[in-house]
Regions:
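Short catalytic micro-motifs in class I SAM-dependent methyltransferases
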Residues: 64-68
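Short glycine-dipeptide loop
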Residues: 85-90
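Solvent-exposed polar/charged
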Residues: 83-84, 124
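A short, conserved alpha-helix within the catalytic core of class I
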Residues: 69-81, 94
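Class I (Rossmann-like) S-adenosyl-L-methionine-dependent methyltransferase catalytic domain
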Residues: 1-51, 77, 91-185
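Alpha-helix C-terminal capping/helix-to-coil transition sites in glycosyltransferase folds
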Residues: 56-57
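A conserved beta-strand element that flanks and buttresses the S-adenosyl-L-methionine
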Residues: 61
């Protein structure tokens, strides 16, 4: 019974992550593309090197894997390697270490699970200072998973192509610049 509940929760998380990815970047994301191979098949050597050419894929997805890659430095190396093989960017999801169900499901890797601050510190040291955005998915009212989008080219970021907000939406004040609290939709 408890395992069925866990399986249903994981399936729901996968579906919500696929929907979030689809809405977040506008590409056609399917759950089958978010499936991982058996973690036992992953290379165990310290150097993270994937057998692909530079920029071989448009987008690279890494679903609930980064937290299994040892310490912080090795996880940063994994992010760098994912960026190397991606032309446009990467999508990374990871369980939130603050979610009670996640702590119960993964007690052996709880110390390596992430929160928003640890994800930010990893992205801040990536080469080229890429554009990135961090989001989350809620399960039972708690942030259960974080998802990270990193664009290699700032010009490809969706915000670079957004239409300016209509003049009627801007705050009153004539030619004064908008306040720091105001942002176009």
């Amino acid at each position: 019974m408890p395992f069925e509940l866990i399986e249903r929760a994981q399936q729901r998380c996968r579906q919500r992550l696929a929907q979030a990815f689809d809405a977040f970047c506008g590409d056609d994301a399917r759950q089958s593309r978010l499936e991982l191979r058996d973690p036992e098949q992953l290379p165990s050597h310290e150097r993270v090197r994937l057998p692909y050419e530079d920029g071989e894929f448009d987008w690279v997805a890494c679903h609930e894997l980064i937290e299994t890659f040892g310490g912080h430095e090795r996880q940063v190396r994994l992010l760098r390697e994912l960026l190397r093989i991606a032309r446009r960017g990467i999508f990374v999801s990871t369980p939130n270490r603050g979610h009670p169900l996640v702590r119960w499901m993964y007690p052996e890797r709880h110390a390596r699970l992430h929160d928003a601050l640890t994800i930010k510190t990893m992205v801040d040291v990536l080469p080229g200072r890429p554009v990135w955005k961090l989001g989350h998915v809620r399960l039972a009212g708690f942030k259960s998973h974080y998802f990270l989008m990193v664009w290699k080219d700032a010009a490809a970021h969706p915000a670079q192509h957004a239409e300016p907000a209509p003049q009627a939406d801007r705050p009153a004040g004539g030619t004064e610049p908008p306040s720091a609290a105001w942002r176009p939709r």
